[in-house]
């Protein structure tokens, strides 16, 4: 039939149940995981301590 697919049509187990390209929920979880990973990388590089230059001996 035409229209959105029903979740009962797909029988996924394991991680495929939450991350797949067949259901709207699965696609949403993939997008959220991608955006979350990118946000964590940005935060890591923004908040990590800055390296101070070594003291030069004169």
Curated annotation (Swiss-Prot):
GO terms for cellular component: mitochondrial membrane; mitochondrion; proton-transporting ATP synthase complex. InterPro entries: ATPMK. It comes from the Eukaryota. It is a single-pass membrane protein. The modification N6-acetyllysine is found at residues 16-17. Keywords: Acetylation, Membrane, Mitochondrion, Transmembrane, Transmembrane helix. Its main location: mitochondrion. The chain crosses the membrane at residues 23-45. Ubiquitous. Highly expressed in skeletal and cardiac muscle. Moderately expressed in brain, thymus, stomach and testis. Lowest expression levels were detected in lung, liver, kidney, adrenal gland, spleen, small intestine and adipose tissue. In streptozotocin-induced diabetes, the insulin-sensitive tissues skeletal and cardiac muscle were down-regulated. Component of the ATP synthase complex composed at least of ATP5F1A/subunit alpha, ATP5F1B/subunit beta, ATP5MC1/subunit c (homooctomer), MT-ATP6/subunit a, MT-ATP8/subunit 8, ATP5ME/subunit e, ATP5MF/subunit f, ATP5MG/subunit g, ATP5MK/subunit k, ATP5MJ/subunit j, ATP5F1C/subunit gamma, ATP5F1D/subunit delta, ATP5F1E/subunit epsilon, ATP5PF/subunit F6, ATP5PB/subunit b, ATP5PD/subunit d, ATP5PO/subunit OSCP. This is ATP synthase F(0) complex subunit k, mitochondrial. It comes from Rattus norvegicus (Rat). The lineage of its organism: Eukaryota, Metazoa, Chordata, Craniata, Vertebrata. The gene is Atp5mk.
